[in-house]
Each structure stands twice: as structure tokens, then as C-alpha cells.
């Protein structure tokens, strides 16, 4: 089994090549997608400026109040069904789900989170409608049909929650016992000094998180990849905009993070 995460940058630029490659993996994959760029676009069209929180360590996450949550769910639903429709056009039986459907992904709401403000001070703020995964009904995700999962979970109180897409993909892969997790974005992998780093051990990945060239979403990807690799799960960070991107990633393209 493999888990393929289609990053928001790919979703918003051109997911065609990923979707066209998925029929080769319809019987052995689970797909997770992002789409934060569409959320940002919709919010701005509504006159709402997207808000982000910086956490100790430099990780950045979206602040999701109730109004943002509504837009988030709307955007993810559009992306999800668009991918599923494209797969059906290719002859692939696919089922689009949020984590709330069938109770597939259950999460606990983060009531409070620690952030770093614009003055560099740490403080605790309301967590909004963001969750941490506590359970995944993996048997409901196994193919057939090919499942396409959006990063929306449900709490024990019946609340819809925003879940980080990369983290959800990792949690799905871990619970499925997948062999590989393929993270597809609009870059060729981890780039240090202008070149792609082809292979890393978990320990090396953890160390590189401190590198000034590693920023934003790549920092989160490396931390998660290191954790996954320690469990024996190979993580590939690769480009989803190239021809046959899944084939390419599994054949050595991108950055491969392995146990060691």
C-alpha cells in the first residue's frame, strides 16, 4: 500500500498529471489532498484576510475560526469531488470522502495553542476549529474503490475540524501499514544549496530542520518524514507537476527519507 498526498500547490496549479497517473495505483493506494490556496482565494473574495499562527520552532498553521471553517470545508469539497470526477472519466472507481464521512477520521479539537506573536513573545491563544487526529477507521479506506480523502475530521462532539493535510497523510499511512508515503508539491524535493537532497535518514532529516534554507511547509514535511521513517515508512517528497509524478517519485525522483 502507498499513500499519495496531493499538495495544495499542485491542486491549485495543475493536478492533471497526478490524477492521470493514479489509475496505475487504484488497487493499492489511498489519496489525501490539500488545497489551502483555494481557501485563501475564497476568503479574499469574501473580503476576509486569511490568518496564520506561528508556533515555537517556526511551524506555521492556519487560524480557523467558524467562518474560515465553513470556507475550508467548501473548498475541500470542491477539490475532492473534482478529483473524483476526473478519476471516473479515466475509468477509475473512486470514492471521495471527508474524515467526517463514515466517521473515518476522528479528531480532538485543540482548545488552546502556543504561538509566537509579532514581537517574538510566546502566548496561548484559542485553537479555533483545528484538530489533532485521534483515530482513523483504516478498513474503510482500503481499496477498492480508490478513496480520495480531504483533510476535514469530526470531533466526538460532532464538530467539523481542519486537519493538517500532510499530518493526515502520515497518520493514514502509519495506521494502514503502508510501505511508502508520497508527498507531492510544486518543488522537486528538499533543496539545499540549490540542489535536491536525494536521500536522508531520519536523523539527518531532524538535523536539517534547523537549516535556514528549510522553511514553511518543508519544515513540517521533514519533521513528519523523520517520525515516519523511524517507524519504517519511507517518505518521498517530490514534484507533482512533472509527467507521471507518482511513478517518478517511486523510481527515485525527489527526496527519500528512510529509517537510519
Swiss-Prot record:
InterPro entries: AceGlu_kinase-like_sf, AcgluKinase_fam, Asp/Glu/Uridylate_kinase, LysZ. Transmembrane segments: none annotated. Substrate binds at residues 35-36, 62, 162. Its main location: cytoplasm. It catalyses: [amino-group carrier protein]-C-terminal-N-(1,4-dicarboxybutan-1-yl)-L-glutamine + ATP = [amino-group carrier protein]-C-terminal-N-(1-carboxy-5-phosphooxy-5-oxopentan-1-yl)-L-glutamine + ADP; [amino-group carrier protein]-C-terminal-gamma-(L-glutamyl)-L-glutamate + ATP = [amino-group carrier protein]-C-terminal-gamma-(5-phospho-L-glutamyl)-L-glutamate + ADP. Disulfide bonds: none annotated. GO terms for biological process: arginine biosynthetic process via ornithine; L-arginine biosynthetic process; lysine biosynthetic process via aminoadipic acid. One of its GO terms (molecular function) is N2-acetyl-L-aminoadipate kinase activity. Pathway: Amino-acid biosynthesis; L-lysine biosynthesis via AAA pathway; L-lysine from L-alpha-aminoadipate (Thermus route): step 2/5; Amino-acid biosynthesis; L-arginine biosynthesis. The keyword Nucleotide-binding applies. Its EC number is 2.7.2.17, 2.7.2.19. It is an enzyme of class 2 (transferase). Belongs to the acetylglutamate kinase family. LysZ subfamily. This is Putative [LysW]-aminoadipate/[LysW]-glutamate kinase. It comes from Pyrobaculum neutrophilum (strain DSM 2338 / JCM 9278 / NBRC 100436 / V24Sta).
Amino acid at each position: 500500500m502507498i499513500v499519495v498526498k496531493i499538495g495544495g500547490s499542485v491542486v491549485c496549479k495543475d493536478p492533471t498529471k497526478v490524477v492521470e497517473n493514479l489509475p496505475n495505483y487504484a488497487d493499492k493506494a489511498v489519496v489525501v489532498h490539500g488545497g489551502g490556496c483555494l481557501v485563501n482565494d475564497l476568503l479574499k473574495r469574501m473580503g476576509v484576510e486569511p490568518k496564520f499562527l506561528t508556533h515555537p520552532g517556526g511551524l506555521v498553521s492556519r487560524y480557523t475560526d467558524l467562518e474560515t471553517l465553513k470556507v475550508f470545508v467548501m473548498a475541500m469539497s470542491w477539490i475532492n469531488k473534482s478529483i473524483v470526477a476526473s478519476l471516473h472519466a479515466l475509468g477509475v472507481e473512486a470514492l471521495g470522502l471527508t474524515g467526517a464521512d463514515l466517521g473515518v477520521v476522528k479528531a480532538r479539537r485543540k482548545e488552546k495553542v502556543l504561538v509566537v506573536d509579532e514581537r517574538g513573545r510566546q502566548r496561548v491563544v484559542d485553537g479555533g476549529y483545528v484538530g489533532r487526529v485521534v483515530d482513523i477507521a483504516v478498513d474503510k479506506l482500503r481499496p477498492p474503490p480508490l478513496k480520495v480523502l480531504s483533510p476535514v475530521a469530526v470531533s466526538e462532539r460532532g464538530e467539523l475540524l481542519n486537519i493538517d493535510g500532510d499530518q493526515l497523510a502520515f497518520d493514514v499511512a502509519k495506521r494502514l501499514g503502508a510501505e511508502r508515503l508520497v508527498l507531492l508539491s510544486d518543488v522537486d524535493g528538499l533543496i539545499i544549496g540549490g540542489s535536491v537532497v536525494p536521500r536522508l535518514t531520519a536523523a539527518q532529516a531532524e538535523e536539517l530542520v534547523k537549516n535556514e534554507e528549510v522553511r514553511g511547509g518543508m519544515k513540517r514535511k521533514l519533521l513528519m518524514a523523520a517520525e515516519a521513517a523511524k517507524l519504517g515508512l519511507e517518505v518521498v517528497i517530490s514534484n507533482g507537476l512533472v509527467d507521471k509524478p507518482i511513478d517518478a517519485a517511486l523510481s527515485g525522483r525527489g527526496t527519500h527519507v528512510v529509517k537510519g
